[in-house]
Amino acid sequence: MADICPSRSEPTLSFTQGLILGQLSVVLLLAAFIKFFIFGDPPSPEVVASIRATDRRSRTLAHKKSILSLRETNALQLVQNPALNKKHVLRPGPPILTIGSILSKTYYKVDSHQPESLDWFNVLIAQTIAQFRSDAQHDDAILSSLSKALNGTARPDFLDEIKVTELSLGEDFPIFSNCRIIPVDEDGLSFGTGKAFDANMATREGARLQARMDVDLSDMITLAVETKLLLNYPKRLSAVLPVALAVSVVRFSGTLSISFIPSNPSNNEPAKMIFTFLDDYRLDFSIRSLLGSRSRLQDVPKIAQLVESRLHRWFDERCVEPRFQEIALPNMWPRKKNTRGGDETISDVERSMSKAKGVDIAKDVREEARKEIEAEAHGGADRVPDSLRYRHRPRADEEFPGAGSMPGSMPGSMP
């Protein structure tokens, strides 16, 4: 019987030893996670910038290849079915002002023209930004707009109200340089990269001129906020974790591309200006964080990486090629309602003065007018009035006393 039912082997570890071993494993995993994931040293900014630039460039090249392949497919369909090519029937010829004619009449040679420095443009932009910063110092509109944007409907439930604690618009100004004009097609692709420009290539519908300029900004533009992480499980407000975050833009350099799209009266579309940044830009942040109320964790590297990655993705999805921002331009033709200056300016000043001062200004003006009239009345008897209405034509005897006749009278005339 002992040979049929073998005896069970005794476990080498007791229950207590297994429990302790399991707890140690969990502690080691948590320690490794905290050390390498949360407090691990982030990669250098140069490495991160290189990786992001490579990803953006690969995305741009993939978009360009898809556009070129789509063009080849459409061209093949037009060759196989000429009836689809209605462009030549509806539009017998290119517009009068083509890209080639504009470049020739403005004496701009794409291949040989030297890039411009844009010093005058930098001065105008600096004045505009300085005025914007000055207005922000005396107005809370920008703070109100930021608070509404941060506490909008997209705020998750586990976040408390977000408060803006610091806002710095910087002290320096962006520098634009190396501006050049490049003809592009309707998809924003250059004509014949590496070849001499031919005006006949730019006669396609949608072709336009594109201004590209380098932008460089080294400043400290800071936005600091604070909020609380709310743990609503298993019951509401089970735990609260204060969080403070400050994000600063310290460096931006890239290539800005600006294009002008004419209006289309047939579709009732206004003229537009589009701008985008090429994929070779660099955007550096300085991110500071603070977690907790008593035992605080300061400048957690992983939080900085997550926030920076989210900001880069937000910027890429909005104004980095192939995406762009579009601005509708108003009608540039002079209109009466847009006229300023002259009599309207005087009337506007008078209305503003009446609103600001009201009865006090009118009273002072009447008092000054009364004093002037009284002074003229007292001194009127002692001086001869010079007004034209007090003058009279002099008689002959007053102008030439002692003469009986007008000088120069003919002999034999009546005295």
Curated annotation (Swiss-Prot):
Region Disordered: start-end pairs: 373-415
CDD domains: SMP_Mmm1
Annotated PROSITE patterns: SMP
Keyword terms of this UniProt record: Endoplasmic reticulum, Lipid transport, Lipid-binding, Membrane, Transmembrane, Transmembrane helix, Transport
Main location: endoplasmic reticulum
Membrane topology: Single-pass type I membrane protein
Highest taxon, organism lineage: Eukaryota
Positions in the Lumenal compartment: 1-18
Annotated protein name in UniProt: Maintenance of mitochondrial morphology protein 1
Native organism: Neurospora crassa (strain ATCC 24698 / 74-OR23-1A / CBS 708.71 / DSM 1257 / FGSC 987)
Lineage: Eukaryota, Fungi, Dikarya, Ascomycota, Pezizomycotina
